[in-house]
UniProtKB/Swiss-Prot annotation:
This is Alanine--tRNA ligase. It comes from Methanopyrus kandleri (strain AV19 / DSM 6324 / JCM 9639 / NBRC 100938). The gene is alaS. InterPro entries: aa-tRNA-synth_II/BPL/LPL, Ala-tRNA-lgiase_IIc, Ala-tRNA-ligase_IIc_anticod-bd, Ala-tRNA-synth_IIc_core, Ala-tRNA-synth_IIc_N, Ala-tRNA_lgiase_arc, Ala-tRNA_ligase, Thr/Ala-tRNA-synth_IIc_edit. It is found in: Cytoplasm. One of its GO terms (cellular component) is cytoplasm. The lineage of its organism: Archaea, Methanobacteriati, Methanobacteriota, Methanomada group, Methanopyri. Binds 1 zinc ion per subunit.
Length: 915
């Protein structure tokens, strides 16, 4: 978009004597002192601060953050604590990617007041779109601190004008120039334009000595149908790179040296990596030149290294020998810090969501360690050191070290096992396709945990070249940045609500959850796919939501009645699906909720909150709800956990849950201001998922658990009744499902178990206390009988095979025999076939083993017969499969057993013998 220059004209620039200029190198406009000639940003200039820092102070990353806080606190900004790096309050992204993300969507949309205005925050952020560049450009991080000072002007809940462009630029100038002592002639404010999330506005990029230190965004437009409209509220959205401020004030060769300090030397020493004066010179030069270009591909990296080698008069191979191990050290430290935050904030590595992204970072760190021939377990030591370094500023992370280390140990073990298993998968795919595409590499990584570099090495051993994109991990991360959209299947109801402009339904059940009978007025009736849906002005029927199934009941009026079969809420409008007569619009209806069903659902829902907290206390506070469903018979709770839940842990969870029931704790349900609720209870409020709105309904089990929840709940835990865990399963890597029942449903499950036990005892004619011993004895006897049967089957198969040479068909000089078998072990068959063809040089013996609609084939050829491998290739075509082997023995399989007959086998032998 072409921006009006007046958007950037400020009285402050005139006050300090800055002028608007056009950079002769890039053609972009910037504001700077009269003597400035270029915009001061790479690639128009090189980094000139490396080895020559322009600031009057020298700050590490923690000191830079403190100075940032103190400066803005003195300028009347309220300091906020950091938000988690996992964006629990949002359903569109997994990770916190910017400081403004902490206030989206509720504050920026105007729905919720800002927690402070103006405010300042030093927010740890994670972006993985440049993960492949971490370590080698000198400036890229997976986790970085974004210092943000934000002002929400004319906000619906705070109509003040806080400050806008003039004050924003003044504050940035004073912090950078006056506070940090960077000469004014070195700073430039480069004009730019920002767009994102449907909003847009002009912005300044703040640049010193080639390095962009901050971005000052003025969110003042919304994008509507390709047009820009003024927003009623205008938001100051700034992002200061705290790591970059540390780098520019220290002048270190790379940002990693500025951020990690002594950890770089300690880690390098442990890994046998030498960082001497030559190495630091090379690394500094690499960072300078990397700033002049986008290093996105392997060819870019080669260009970078060649340019630096020429400048330093070095052989490029020598440069790589010195620099690459240090780049690996930088990457390992960066990834360790990122993991300390991810795991410390409760992420459980898995194959989905934020857990997938954590696993991606872990496995890239392990690949870097592999590249240095280091023990993978060394990652644990690096993370331990990083946690100690973080302890002063983020003590909460160090407190979770036990979980962090345990999760990493699990992941290291999984990765090692995945590599062993994965090699077979790579070779299998190469046999099938003869190549590995990018999509193959992604699937091998996603489904089997095989890094693309390993897949390439295996393929090269098989003589197949594979191209691995240099930004592989970045591209994979982008695929998993946001949650997958779930199809709700309620589009037609949503269309009706919008087109009919239906008013929101009064949710009366929140006023009295015990009330089951009520009167209401019919707002409208609608037919959707043959079903009748009724909208009332008010309802006590709970609509499906939060994993809780909908209420059912009846609806009666003067001339008819109907059963309520389903209830759904769309855009605040509650639709009731009915079976029976259809009431007219405007009619008064008498409704009754099925009380028994409601009570069962209510008990199971409150029990879910109890079980979740019990799981957190037994397994650790990294446990997070990944899903839940509450029906009348049982409930299920999916929780994140890096290990399988043991029998002992499951029993302790059940014991704790029932202890809470017996304590009869009050269950408080109230609507609260979102900001107040978050301040009081933290983001664990959102265990059950994101809840929209300025006000959220908070369900608190006193002294036990607090969640934002819209479901129906008991008034005290005693109302739940007994809780019985009935099962557990691993539904995906990193997610455990706990199945349980509460109240009458729990008793029913206990009775079912007792009935099963009694019936079993009657069949076996034993008392319950003797059942385990009796079953064990029967099982041992069964195993012994099974062994005898298997031995007899093997003897029968061998006898059938050994009789084959005498029963075969003569084809010229050869004896051709097809033996058909069912459900036998291939290994024993192959051994017998191999023995027989050694004894009979003119024998062709083929065993077809049929099982579950497919078949496996063993081919044996005597010394004078056609080669077994060639026979197998032809047979593979008949059975719609494949296989291979050598001249004497071959094996294969296919999905069409009927394709191989003795006549077809004879034809194949004749063709090969004749050829």
């Amino acid at each position: 978009m072409k921006v009006d220059p007046s958007e950037f004209e400020l009285e402050f620039f005139e006050e300090i004597g800055f002028e608007r200029k056009r950079c002769p190198e890039c053609g972009e406009y910037f504001w700077g002192p009269p003597e400035a000639e270029v915009c001061n940003e790479t690639p128009c200039v090189e980094y000139s601060f490396i080895g020559d820092p322009p600031a009057s102070v020298k700050l590490d990353v923690w000191e830079a953050g403190e100075e940032f806080f103190r400066f803005f606190e003195r300028h009347d900004h309220e300091v906020l604590d950091r938000y988690p790096v996992v964006a629990r309050w949002r359903d569109d992204i997994h990770l916190t990617i910017a400081s403004i993300a902490c206030f989206q969507p509720w504050v920026t949309s105007g729905e919720v007041p800002p927690p402070a205005n103006p405010l300042v925050i030093n927010q740890p952020c994670i972006r993985l779109n440049d993960i492949d560049n971490v370590g080698r450009t000198g400036r890229h991080f997976t986790l970085f601190h974004m210092g943000g000072h934000h002002a929400f002007n004319n906000h619906p809940h705070d109509r003040r004008d806080i400050y806008w462009k003039e004050e924003t630029v003044r504050l940035c100038y004073e912090f950078t120039v006056e506070k940090l002592g960077i000469p004014e002639e070195k700073i430039a404010f480069k004009e730019s334009w920002w767009e994102g999330g449907g909003n847009a506005g002009p912005c300044f990029e703040v640049v010193v000595d080639g390095l962009e230190l901050a971005t000052l965004v003025f969110m003042q437009y919304e994008q509507v149908g390709g047009e820009y409209r003024e927003l009623p509220q205008k938001i100051v959205d700034t992002g200061y790179g705290i790591e970059r401020y540390a780098w520019i004030t220290t002048g270190e060769p790379t940002a990693y040296d500025a951020v990690f300090g002594d950890l770089v030397d300690a880690t390098a020493r442990d890994l046998g990596v030498e960082i001497d004066g030559e190495a630091r010179e090379i690394l500094g030069e690499l960072a300078r030149v990397a700033g002049l270009m986008d290093v996105e591909t392997e060819s870019d990296l080669r260009v970078l290294r060649n340019r630096v080698a020429r400048r330093l008069d070095l052989d490029v191979n020598e440069l790589v020998r010195v620099a690459e191990p240090v780049e690996f050290v930088y990457g390992i430290l960066d990834h360790a810090r990122c993991l300390a935050f991810m795991l410390g904030d409760g992420v459980v590595p898995s194959n989905a969501g934020e857990g997938y992204l954590a696993r991606l970072v872990i496995r890239r760190a392990l690949r870097l360690l592999d590249g240095l021939d280091a023990e993978r377990e060394y990652l644990l030591e690096v993370v331990e050191r990083v946690l100690e370094d973080l302890r002063g500023t983020y003590p909460e992370l160090a407190e979770r070290e036990e979980y962090i280390q345990d999760a990493l140990e699990c992941e290291i073990d999984r990765y090692t096992r995945a590599l062993k298993r994965g090699k077979k998968e790579v070779r299998k795919r190469l046999e099938e396709k003869g190549e590995l595409s990018f999509e193959d590499l992604v699937e091998l990584y996603d489904s089997h945990g095989i890094p693309p570099e390993v897949a390439r090495e295996i393929a090269e051993d098989e003589g197949v070249e594979v191209e691995v994109p240099d930004d592989f991990y970045s591209r994979v991360a982008e695929r998993h940045e946001g949650p997958e959209e779930v199809e709700e299947g309620l589009e037609e109801l949503e269309r009706i609500a919008v087109e009919e402009e239906l008013p929101e339904t009064e949710l009366a059940f929140y006023d009295d959850e015990k009330r089951l009978e009520f009167k209401a007025e019919v707002i409208g009736t609608y037919e959707v796919n043959g079903d009748a849906w009724v909208v009332l002005d008010r309802t006590y029927f709970y609509p499906e939501g939060g994993g809780q199934e909908a209420d059912r009941g009846t609806m009666r009026w003067k001339d008819g009645e109907a059963e309520v079969k389903d209830v759904q809420k769309v855009r605040g409008v509650v639709f009731h699906r009915i079976d029976g007569d259809v009431p007219p619009e405007g009619a008064e209806v008498e409704c009754e909720v099925d009380g028994e069903r409601r009570m069962r659902l209510t008990r199971n829902h409150t029990a879910t909150h109890v079980i979740l907290e019990a799981a957190r206390r037994v397994l650790g506070d990294h446990v997070w709800q990944a899903g839940a469903h509450k029906s009348t018979d049982e409930a299920r709770l999916d929780v994140t956990h890096h290990r399988r839940i043991s029998d002992e842990e499951l029993r302790e969870i059940e014991r704790l849950a029932n202890e809470i029931v017996m304590k009869d704790l009050p269950v408080n349900k109230r609507f609260m201001d979102r900001n107040e609720a978050e301040r009081r209870y933290g983001f664990e409020l959102y265990q059950g998922g994101v809840v929209p709105g300025r006000e959220i309904r908070v369900v608190e089990i006193e002294g036990w658990n607090v969640q934002a929840c819209a479901g129906t709940h008991c008034d005290s835990t005693g109302e739940i009744g007994p809780i019985k865990i009935v099962g557990r399963e691993r539904i995906q890597d990193g997610v455990e499902r706990i199945r349980f029942a509460a109240g009458e449903a729990a008793l029913e499950r206990i009775w079912e178990t007792e009935d099963l036990l009694r019936e079993t005892c009657e069949v076996l004619r034993v008392n319950p206390e003797n059942l385990p011993k009796t079953v064990k004895r029967f099982f041992e006897e069964w195993k012994e009988q099974r062994k005898r049967i298997e031995r007899l089957e093997r003897e029968l198969v061998e006898a059938k095979l050994r009789a084959a040479p005498a029963e075969g068909r003569r084809v010229g000089d050869f004896t051709v025999t097809l033996v058909e078998l069912e459900d036998v072990e291939v290994g024993s068959v192959a051994g017998t076939v191999e023995e027989l063809v050694k004894e009979h040089e003119n024998l062709v013996l083929v065993a077809k083993i049929v099982s579950n609609g497919s078949c496996q084939v063993v081919v044996g050829s005597g010394e004078s017969a056609p080669p077994a491998g060639e026979l197998m290739r032809e047979i593979g075509k008949l059975i719609e499969g494949g296989g291979g082997g050598d001249e004497r023995l071959a094996q294969g399989g296919g999905r069409n057993p009927d394709g191989l007959t003795e006549d077809r086998l004879v034809e194949i032998v004749e063709d090969l013998a004749g050829g």
